[in-house]
UniProtKB/Swiss-Prot annotation:
Enzyme Commission number(s): 4.1.1.52
Gene: yanB
Disruption of the gene: reported phenotype: Loses the ability to produce yanuthone D.
Residues bearing attached sugar chains per UniProt: 169
Practical use: Yanuthone D is an antibiotic against C.albicans, methicillin-resistant S.aureus (MRSA), and vancomycin-resistant Enterococcus.
Record's keyword terms, sorted: Decarboxylase, Glycoprotein, Lyase, Membrane, Metal-binding, Transmembrane, Transmembrane helix, Zinc
Protein name per the record: Decarboxylase yanB
Entry binding sites for Zn(2+): 7, 9, 159, 283
Membrane topology per record: Single-pass membrane protein
Broad class of enzyme this protein falls into: lyase
Organism of provenance: Aspergillus niger (strain ATCC 1015 / CBS 113.46 / FGSC A1144 / LSHB Ac4 / NCTC 3858a / NRRL 328 / USDA 3528.7)
Amino acid sequence: MDRIDVHHHFIPPAYVEAFKTTGGDPSGWHLPQWTPESSLSLMDSHNTRTAILSLTAPGTSILAHSPGASATLAREINLYAAKLHNENPTRFGFFASLPHLTPDTIPAAIEEAIYALETLHADGITLYTRYTGTGYLGHDAFAPLWEELNRRKAVVFIHPTNTAADARNRSILVNPALPQPIIDYPHETCRTAVDLITSGTISRNPDVKIILSHGGGTLPILATRAAHLLYDAKLTSISPEDFLEQARSFYFDLALSGNDENMQLLVGRNGFAKGGHVFYGSDFPYAPVSTINKYVRMMEGFSVQGEEVEKAIARDSAVKLFPRFQMPADLRVGKTNNWGAFSACLLLPVGLSALYSVLQSRVHTYST
């Protein structure tokens, strides 16, 4: 069964250079080695035909101290991602990066989002769970960005980032064996999801499709608790029923979350996620290949809901959200590598258009 990986990171050269000038990842995690070939190798090993690339945290916020530099980095990263897609149209898509978000940089972020979606044909936009100095994604300052994304019916991929930080925005580790991506990131995803609901951002922008990383973090576990406590304590006017409906409107990837317990919670009997709202994700290259392999085996061993749910998670649900990666049915048979044939299908309209232009030119020449 072929897959579409919606949680697959890349590390552009410009991002590596930014890390060198700022002292490394503030989350406490390491910067792995990455090349496009390493992504393709992992994809082939798991029959993944398409990976939608994204920049992990902190993203362009690594240059939060310099808004201009952050905006320049976002553009360089998006151009690099678009180049990878153009060179490998069936294998790579991408979620575009934006400059570090503050109230002052929202206009630049909107400009970059429009450029990425309209000109570079990005598959969506990457946002992080919070931004230093502003807060979580339901903050009033972000409202114009959400309005623009809603107007465009955009897909937004939300990735967690570090929470507690020192004056240099570097993570405060209570235990060096607990880098924030391991434990804290799932909590951050829940926090920003609840913030989006209680701030009214979700209800005001119903046409944005939001993907939460890592199975939604702790949201599926805590949503009912939050829904009732917030309402009963009169901290929100949103009814528990409405709160839970909004919480279930998110999409969820299974990066590092495809174990049996999470699968039962999301897609088992009375699962938290709506049908068609759960996707495969690997978290390559930040997750070790050995860990990715384990989670793939766990997902393949989960069969409570049958083959249709398995196919939906692996590929079909993602195709509905990203139709440009639909593969003709006759090219999906078996496990043969048909990328070249599919590329030919994609490029055929381009060739026909060029042929039409040539013929038109000749007709014009003969007529004169």
